[in-house]
């Protein structure tokens, strides 16, 4: 059973609100030097924005990697989304994975500065 247009619009709006909230949180964390938390919030901002885009166009993905893949194939590779934004999303996913590791990794804000 698919979503109605109203349900789809509501879901897109909720995802975009979450993305905006997370990017504001990421900026705050970045200003405090909380690099790992900023990377996490930047990633989830990208993730929810990408999910909103997929939902809007009737596409879906069931995993984080799937979302990145569907987003890349349908929007970055087609030129609908700038490659720099696609690269930023990929970079934030990598940083999220690294910062989720309980072992110290020598993480700094250098990689985030490229955003």
Labelled PLM ranges:
Residues 1-115:
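Terminal alpha-helical segments
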